[in-house]
Amino acid sequence: MDHRLLEIVACPVCNGKFYYNKERQELICKSDALAYPLCDGIPVLLESEARAIKLDETNS
């Protein structure tokens, strides 16, 4: 995952910042508690593809 991409992309729901979870290959939006998957290194920024996460998962 190119960390420069994190400076450009924003959460499609709240326009907030993402945090990269390398272990799960996901972009995490702490504001909405949503995790967006990466497919071959490309973020899938569709709300319908995001999974809800628990608050303790946002610390990853």
UniProtKB/Swiss-Prot annotation:
Annotated InterPro entries: Trm112-like (IPR005651)
A GO CC annotation given for this chain: cytosol
Top-level taxon in the UniProt lineage: Bacteria
One Pfam family hit: Trm112p
Gene3D superfamilies on file: 2.20.25.10
Family (UniProt): Belongs to the UPF0434 family.
Name of the protein described by the UniProt record: UPF0434 protein SG0997
Organism: Sodalis glossinidius (strain morsitans)
